[in-house]
């Protein structure tokens, strides 16, 4: 404990680190304030009541969970940062199939600037599309027969202004994220998502203890649930950090009077190379049917499909969701990690895996190991993703159940590890002790 206290004390001794932390905190506070500023014309009380009654099993409930509660407040940041994430994914996928984008990814700083610009354009386009869908859903939603958008303000003016406000809100959040990345600590976009998720935890925990106070749940059962949550978080940390290391030997080279090489290094292959991306891919696709159903609010057939077949708590949803996560884990791993490039770079630098011939044989060896460790990683990822649904079926409140797994827990754990790793790097660079004695706290990368 004294070690941890000393580390936090050291953080505030470094002026640059102190300023970066203050700047990051300030911008995250702005994000939270924007998540509570209501869009003009929407009855936020009725909207929050609608989402609460839905038990987070509808499109509204799922979306609100992902944007940190901004949607339930009908806030200007209701779209969250997800349009930017979606645009980034699309650009990354284009880099794997379109030569122009593949070339940009290899052009260093200039290529990165162009990719960033294309990502911004994509964010605007996706934000506009999502905003129009959200406004349409808002205008068609009622609570006890009362519309959440009053008749007096409905019309093209409301539709256009709200679409612009929501799109602008996302672009402003994107700018805040970029500022945090450049002038603060950690990845700004990730931290914005992180703070939105964590901000919901106190209320979710309070809802759980309200059940205990009301006599609905036994205190011992609640304590067991909390202990179980601790084990699940520990398991997610292990999966996030789990690595298979492949030894690489470098031949000795004599340059002048100096001898280079002759050392053993390692290729770290993560059990979960794809990170949270497979869940985001699968979740995005599973949202599509719900979006389609939302345009037919009066159709009994569509409502039946939406609730019993594609509803968040249905077994069909969980089964299809898990299969898609396993598929996308392999798919994204193949895009994010290229064994051939690793083998070629190793060969150029005079490195080799003991017992394996350089070149094609090395590529096949690495690919074989990656395929083997990806299977348990993908199954574990699918299990983590559907855990919240299972916990809801066991009686845990929907808000608290979201912290048992899924995208929320993976993002919280991953971003926390990455940010702590950056803080530790600043400490070690200035000869202070880090969070761990070995100074080897690893992020996700």
Model-derived segments and spans:
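N-terminal cationic and glycine-rich segments that engage phosphates or anionic surfaces
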Residues: 1-105, 109-445
